[in-house]
């Protein structure tokens, strides 16, 4: 007898279904994405669907896809909330290794839900890079999608800001910027816009690694498209063209990354006086009147640093790419930082 369908899944379609999100009578989650790519997730892990493959174009074997078993994980306390679900720490019962377990509950077959699931599962299947949080496996159980992620033991940039009231050195800011923009360069080469770069989605660990997380609202451009119109992400970090609902592209992430690095430097949101007033903030960003007043900052920054941030916050037409930002002179200061020393600094408590 097929397993009983949880009440939360009653809105989802049973196969066959021509698009979107569906489940089979054996409780397999089916996500049909753009271009006809189909991704299937079972209770035991990701299963290959028609047209699915790894980044290199070769299907992944069951041994690779199912190397972590759900039953071997002990799920613990909550780490935080992502764009589409909550994240808890999980520990492997046999090895003791820690993971971050993201779980997403379902509320029906909407375009946003399909896009979110496709983005999350695409990361599990294909997005592998030194500056992107790794995804190891996914499970569909009891009406939830569980995704096993790399555990970043120093937390987010928000956590680092809280732990270091003395502030970040400019060398450390350059180091974080270099790693963040390397990750963005990789994603953009995959035709992917992250769309939610902010301090909460840039993570660190004791190895000194900086990685981008949370792909719940990421958008992959296809079919020769270089722009999109869809509105997803966190409003305070959106670029002017996104606030104005204009077509936007990869360098919208550059604006968000610039604000993220500036927030690490200032220990507060760069346009802090406007943040509680969302309408006024949107107006200021859209009109170009939201500016950083460098003279009001207690900490004095180099001309290099100020230029770097201002380049990120240029209008869309003249805003550089991630590759161009990596050639900026500020990035050279990152070589002054030893990754292991960075990891020790990042893990230090107040």
From Swiss-Prot:
Upper taxonomic lineage: Eukaryota, Discoba, Euglenozoa, Kinetoplastea, Metakinetoplastina
Cofactor: how bound: Can use both Mg(2+) and Mn(2+) in vitro and shows higher activity with Mn(2+) but Mg(2+) is likely to be the in vivo cofactor.
Function noted in UniProt: Protein kinase which regulates promastigote proliferation in host macrophages, thereby playing an essential role in parasite virulence.
Name the UniProt record assigns to this protein: Putative mitogen-activated protein kinase kinase 4
Family note: Belongs to the protein kinase superfamily. STE Ser/Thr protein kinase family. MAP kinase kinase subfamily.
SUPFAM superfamilies: Protein kinase-like (PK-like)
Annotated compartments: Cytoplasm, Cytosol; Cell projection, Cilium, Flagellum; Nucleus
Temperature notes for this entry: Active between 21 and 40 degrees Celsius.
CDD domains in the cross-refs: PKc_MAPKK_plant_like
Domain of life the protein comes from: Eukaryota
Alphabetized UniProt keyword annotations: ATP-binding, Cell projection, Cilium, Cytoplasm, Flagellum, Kinase, Magnesium, Metal-binding, Nucleotide-binding, Nucleus, Transferase
Alphabetized GO MF terms: ATP binding; MAP kinase kinase activity; metal ion binding; protein kinase activity; protein serine kinase activity; protein tyrosine kinase activity
Species annotation: Leishmania mexicana
Catalytic residues (positions): 196 (proton acceptor)
């Amino acid at each position: 007898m097929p397993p009983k369908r949880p009440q939360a899944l009653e809105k989802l379609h049973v196969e066959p279904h021509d698009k979107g999100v569906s489940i089979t009578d054996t409780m397999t989650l089916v996500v049909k994405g753009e271009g006809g790519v189909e991704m299937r997730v079972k209770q035991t892990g990701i299963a290959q669907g028609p047209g699915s493959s790894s980044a290199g174009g070769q299907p992944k074997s069951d041994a690779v896809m199912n190397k972590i078993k759900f039953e071997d994980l002990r799920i613990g306390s909550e780490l935080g909330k992502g764009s589409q679900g909550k994240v808890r720490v999980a520990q492997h019962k046999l090895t003791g290794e820690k993971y971050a377990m993201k779980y997403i509950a379902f509320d029906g077959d909407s375009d946003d839900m399909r896009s979110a699931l496709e983005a999350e599962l695409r990361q599990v299947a294909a997005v592998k890079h030194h500056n992107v949080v790794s995804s190891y496996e996914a499970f569909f159980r009891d009406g939830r999608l569980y995704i096993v992620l790399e555990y970043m033991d120093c937390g987010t940039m928000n956590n680092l800001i809280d732990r270091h009231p003395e502030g970040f050195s400019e060398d450390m800011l350059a180091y974080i910027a270099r790693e963040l923009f390397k990750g963005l360069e990789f994603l953009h080469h995959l035709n992917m816009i992250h769309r939610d770069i902010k301090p909460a989605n840039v993570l660190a660990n004791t190895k000194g690694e900086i990685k981008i997380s949370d792909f719940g609202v990421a958008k992959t451009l296809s079919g020769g498209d270089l722009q999109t119109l869809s509105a997803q992400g966190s409003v305070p970090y959106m670029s002017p063209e996104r606030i104005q609902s204009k077509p936007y592209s990869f360098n919208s992430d550059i604006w968000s990354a610039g604000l993220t690095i500036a927030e690490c430097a200032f220990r507060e949101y760069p346009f802090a006086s406007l943040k509680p007033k969302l309408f006024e903030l949107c107006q200021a960003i859209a009109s170009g009147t939201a500016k950083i007043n460098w003279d009001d900052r207690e900490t004095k920054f180099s001309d290099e640093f100020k230029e770097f941030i201002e380049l990120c916050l240029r209008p869309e037409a003249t805003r550089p790419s991630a590759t161009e930002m990596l050639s900026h002179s500020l990035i050279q200061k990152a070589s002054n930082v030893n990754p292991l020393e960075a990891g020790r600094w990042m893990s230090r408590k107040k």
